[in-house]
Amino acid sequence: MPMSLRLHNNLTRRVEPFAPLDPSSPTLYVCGPTVYNYAHIGNARGPVVFDVLAALLRRRYGALRYARNITDVDDKINAAAQAQGVPISTITDRFAAIYRQDMAALGVVPPDIEPEATAHIPQIVAMIEQLIATGHAYAAEGHVLFSVSSFEDYGKLSRRDPDEMLAGARVDVAPYKRDPGDFVLWKPSSDDLPGWPSPWGRGRPGWHIECSAMAAAHLGPTIDIHAGGVDLQFPHHENEIAQSECAHGGATFARFWLHNGMLNFSGAKMSKSLGNIETVHELIARHPPEALRYALLSAHYRQPLDWSDGLIEQAKNTLDRLYGTLRDLAALEAESGSDLAVSMTIPAEVESALDDDLNTPLALSVMASIASDARALRSDLMQSGQASARMIELHAARAKLLGAGMALGLLQQDPAAWFSRGTDAGDDARITALVEERSAAKKAKDFARADAIRKQLAEEGIVLEDTPQGVRWKRA
């Protein structure tokens, strides 16, 4: 039997046994993307890691209510739409769809609930009204602000002193604020920006209140696990706690807080602001998506991960060995006349590794050991000629390796499909997807991206032809 699930709770800074409030329906909320551009590979670490957690919770409890939001109203979105001269929905619809496609390519199972901020304006307004009514927020010059001093536990997650928090939040010290640390719940909108009617005039919500309202609407006032990147711990998650607990009479907002570490690239944190990012979309065009998933799981989720081409290549080579093992085991079974259906069971050693605060590096190591044992068994059976006599043992070895992969979202394709990557059939689908993306980029007036795709295809010897039926491509 696997041990009980233990998770590092960033609220207490301790690894603690996890038990949901309602064992029949644990709840998980993960902060999702702001859809104004392509997600970079650092943005994918959380979805991949917490996909492993979601699968573990479903196995353990038989059910899960998992929400991951879409932020589709934000100043960055407004800026992107204005820069490209297109409606805001053109930006958000496009990049939300690309995000979903990219996550699917990485093997990330969609959440049960994917709330969008713009679909929850009534809930956001109602929460703000409750905060004003209880003295935790105030209206000023068309804005509504949360009064940080009204919540004595402010800072309990990040454990920063007030001066540190003020610096970290990068808040505007506007004249209408009662305290420099007060943050925006609602802001006025000019006619050229998205806005909704409210008791405080036409406006739009602040970022932090969106997650609080969406989490409460779908998961209730108290959720079991709230997860996201460590860069969101302050101010975003700190502010979520303040808003939510004040709006719900002091009820604990989230019982466990999980934060994944950042990706580093050439020794520096990967971020859009530093310009050192690699997008998921570009990477999955050049590499097997499963190798990217493996690489993202290769370090413990709370630790930084050094991202490099070498890491991806190492992941590819490891998957080559693992899929090669599965292929060879299946071939030996077939040669010996086996018609047993594979019944995957996740090995206890893998479950125990994941129960230890999602120790994916240990789980990957266990999977490698299982594969090594399976190869040794195959060699022994081939040399001794006992494959037929020990068919159940051989079959169990393959099922065990597949089960280990299933727990991590790996090894779920046919080995032949894995080894056919880069062939004309696989490449044709990739090129067609790039051509379609280029057409969508041109329609959205994202000419920089369209030109970049054309250049990439030209370097690969792909010629594009405009026809009345649309764009066609051929190899030069």
Curated annotation (Swiss-Prot):
- UniProt main location, coarse: cytoplasm
Q: Which UniProt keywords apply?
A: Aminoacyl-tRNA synthetase, ATP-binding, Cytoplasm, Ligase, Metal-binding, Nucleotide-binding, Protein biosynthesis, Zinc
Q: Which GO terms describe its cellular component?
A: cytosol
How would you classify this enzyme at the top EC level? ligase
Q: Where in the cell is it found?
A: Cytoplasm
NCBIfam families, per this entry?
cysS
This chain's protein is named Cysteine--tRNA ligase
What organism is this sequence from? Answer: Xanthomonas euvesicatoria pv. vesicatoria (strain 85-10)
Its lineage reads: Bacteria, Pseudomonadati, Pseudomonadota, Gammaproteobacteria, Lysobacterales
Q: Which gene encodes it?
A: cysS
